[in-house]
């Protein structure tokens, strides 16, 4: 089976083609970072308009990259949620229309299932069961995964997601959008131990997260005096260490609770090198394994949607002719494969 995947949930337009036998045949991505930079964040209407202009050309580019014709595609997958409703509608409408015109099935893909399955694109994919840490700008969740669509929510953020806290703290430090990766780079120059940030909710039982207080702590620290580059770097390092430690503590609890030996990290924040190193060391000490996608597949992309769509189509899933998207869509509502 050969599937075309379309991702337009937020500020990246992604199109990819995945073949069941040959793997990833094409991967095209257009980022709207420059479009939204002057606003310090994503402007939904601008995002939707840009997807309208970029989606079809990227589909043409993906087909050309793979050396394929429309008749070589066996299915179309598109992100149907969660995300920005206008942006989602662009990809869903194009995807559904193409599937109808080409006479192939279409499937609506859950954006976070795409992220969760992105490590499956690597040479050493994780086997079930595993604990998944979904950590991005919009989500921070721990999921017990025993199969495709067999997802149990163990805990999630009660306020800001970790990625959102990264971006907002970066803005406090005067960094440009998107701030998370820039904060991580600045943190590498920071002196460890100069500032001590709290590890929120780690002294509470359970697996819930909270990052709004950490963001406030960072804001107060900056206001107290962070005018020079080194001080800002020290604040960035203290903040990053607090987030990484918090995520690691909660992951350890989730692994203890489930007794699983595999941890999967997915979503944009999973590209953070400090987080990867800390989780890798933790799993080494536990005698387990940690899995994550290459950095370009941690952020939004069409490859994860094409792969997730292929898995769902093989399991019998298929979208109706009606175009429908879900800006809010709990991952645990997805059916198990073949159900």
Swiss-Prot record:
GO CC field: cytoplasm
Cofactor comment text = Binds 1 Fe(2+) ion per subunit.
Q: Name which cysteines form disulfide bonds.
A: none
Q: Where on the tree of life does the source sit, at the highest rank? A: Bacteria
List, alphabetically, the Pfam families matched: TsaD
Keyword Chloroplast in the entry? The reply is no
Q: Supply the CDD domains for this chain.
A: ASKHA_NBD_TsaD_bac
Q: Name one GO molecular function term.
A: N(6)-L-threonylcarbamoyladenine synthase activity
Cell compartments where the protein resides: Cytoplasm
The family note in this entry says:
Belongs to the KAE1 / TsaD family.
Name of the protein: tRNA N6-adenosine threonylcarbamoyltransferase
This chain is encoded by the gene named tsaD
């Amino acid at each position: 089976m050969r599937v075309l995947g379309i991702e337009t949930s937020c500020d990246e337009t992604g199109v990819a083609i995945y073949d069941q036998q040959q793997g990833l045949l094409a991967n095209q991505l257009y980022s709207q970072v420059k479009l939204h930079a002057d606003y310090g964040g994503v402007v939904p209407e601008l995002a939707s308009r840009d997807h309208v202009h970029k989606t079809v050309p990227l589909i043409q580019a993906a087909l050309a990259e793979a050396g394929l014709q429309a008749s070589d595609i066996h299915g179309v997958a598109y992100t149907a949620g969660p995300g920005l409703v206008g942006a989602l509608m662009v990809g869903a409408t194009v995807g559904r229309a193409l599937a109808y015109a080409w006479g192939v099935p279409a499937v609506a893909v859950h954006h976070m299932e795409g992220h969760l399955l992105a490590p499956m694109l690597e040479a050493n994919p994780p086997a079930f069961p595993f604990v998944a840490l979904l950590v991005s700008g919009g989500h921070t969740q721990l999921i017990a995964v025993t199969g495709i669509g067999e997802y149990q929510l163990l805990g999630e953020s009660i306020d800001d997601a970790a990625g959102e806290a990264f971006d907002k703290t970066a803005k406090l430090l005067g960094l440009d959008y998107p701030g998370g990766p820039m904060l991580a780079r600045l943190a590498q120059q920071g002196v460890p131990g100069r500032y001590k940030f709290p590890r929120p909710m780690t002294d509470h039982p359970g697996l819930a997260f909270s990052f709004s207080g950490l963001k406030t702590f960072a804001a107060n620290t900056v206001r107290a005096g962070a005018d020079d580059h080194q001080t800002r770097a020290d604040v960035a390092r203290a903040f990053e260490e607090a987030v990484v430690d918090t995520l690691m503590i909660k992951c350890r609890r989730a692994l203890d609770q489930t007794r699983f030996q595999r941890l999967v990290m997915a979503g944009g924040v999973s590209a953070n090198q400090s987080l990867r190193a800390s989780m890798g060391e933790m799993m080494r000490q536990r005698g387990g394994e940690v899995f994550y996608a290459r950095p370009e597949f941690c952020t939004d992309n069409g490859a994860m949607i094409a792969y997730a769509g292929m898995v769902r189509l093989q399991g019998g899933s298929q979208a109706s002719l009606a175009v429908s998207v879900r800006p809010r869509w709990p991952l645990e509502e997805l059916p198990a494969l073949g159900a």
